[in-house]
Amino acid sequence: AGYGDRFTAVHRRFSQVGEAEATGPLHGVLFDLGVSSMQLDEPARGFGYRVDGPLDMRMGDGEVTAADLVNDLPESELADLLYEFGQEHRSRRVAAAIGRARQRARIETTDQLAGVVASALGRRPGGPHPARRTFQALRIAVNRELEELATSLPRAVGLLGPGGRVVVLSYHSLEDGIVKRAFRDDDRLRVLTKKPLQPSDEERARNPRARSAKFRAAERIEEAA
C-alpha cells in the first residue's frame, strides 16, 4: 500500500512471466521460490504438517489437490513421486503405509497424512518432522513447481535489457539445480554467483525458515551483432 501506483500485484504463474505488462526492457527480475509463512501457517491451505487442515496444497486454481494424489495414485507411482520430488529415500515404506491407511478410510487432512508418515518412519527427538519430505513432494507435484521454474527462467531473461539481472532464491536442491543449469546454459547471461550465497548463522537463528535458502544471480549481456 505504501508504494502507490509504483507497484501493481499480478496473480499469475511463473510460466506466465512473459505476459507481464512492461513499458520497456526490465532492469531486474527476482524469483522467490519459497512458500510464504502466511501460506504455511494458514490451515485451510493445507501446506503444513504442524497444524491440521484440508489436504489441499494448491497455490492457485488447479484442479488436482494433494488429497487426490495421496488417495488415487497407484502405490508405486506415489513412491516414485515422493522419491523424485521429496528426495525421500524411504519412499516405498511411506507409500506402503499410505496405501494401507487409505484402504481403511480416505486421507483428507494434513494431520492424517502426517500421522501416517510419522508412524511409518518414526520420529527422532529434536529432529525434523518425518513428513516434511512427503509434504514437499506433494506440494511440488500439485503445483508443477519444477516445470513452472524451468519454463519461466528463459522467458524472464528475454524480458531483460542489457545489464539487467535475474536473481533467484531457492529452498531445496531440486530448484537450485534447475537454476544453476539454466544460468550456465543460457548464452545471454553472465553468471554473477559461481557458488550460491547462503544465510549466515545469525540469519538462520533469526529466521529458521531461511536456513536452506540459496541465492543465485546472473546478468543479461549484449547479444552479438
Language-model features, listed with the residues they occupy:
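S-adenosyl-L-methionine-dependent methyltransferase catalytic core, i.e., the SAM/SAH-binding region
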Residues: 1-225
